[in-house]
Amino acid sequence: NIYDVNGKLLAYNKLVYTVNFQNDSAFQTLAKQNGTSESYEKNEVIYKVIKILERNGDSFINDIPIEYTGSGKLRFTETGSRLKKFKRDVFGIGSDTSDLSQSEKELRNKQLNATAEEVFQYLRDGTMGSSGTGKMFDIDKKYSKEDALKIMSVRYSAFLSRYSQYMKVTIANEINSKSIAEIKERSSELPGIDIDTKSIRVYNKSEAVSHIIGY
């Protein structure tokens, strides 16, 4: 803890609860039992957790720079170099084009100029991907566009950590007791999900004391 000269608390550590998602062998087992796919089972679990959080007044972390508008359309929330990097990450676009065929160069250009709707469709089912890309997150059509985007956000965060297969991805921070209780009660139907704790720094009247504590 940090105090001022009068003993008033300026900053302290606060313990909060987080919800995490990671790959689990249970998804493969469920897929075999239900005649589905691992992606289908992952999406089901993520959807259930997001609805639990929303129902209890908590929010989930959305790291994908696409938003759903009130008119039912999609748009990017980033521009310039940030948006270009996002598209490169999504489509796996490298900077070297010397070994690409003409058709591959055309596809590369199309992907770099993809609209929010096109990126969404690619992540949902692989549309506009290169040969052999597959169905990406294979998000079932039963989910609305808005819900599919929410599922996609969690899957995309896990996708960025794909080279560390069992690395946890944080879905939500600072969840309340209602969400904690419901997730724990339904743990048997939520493989790959766990609740953890972490310490965050809290600053009292941070603007007034930032010059003192370097915040």
Locate each region found by the language model.
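Membrane-proximal periplasmic segments of bacterial cell-envelope enzymes
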Residues: 1-215
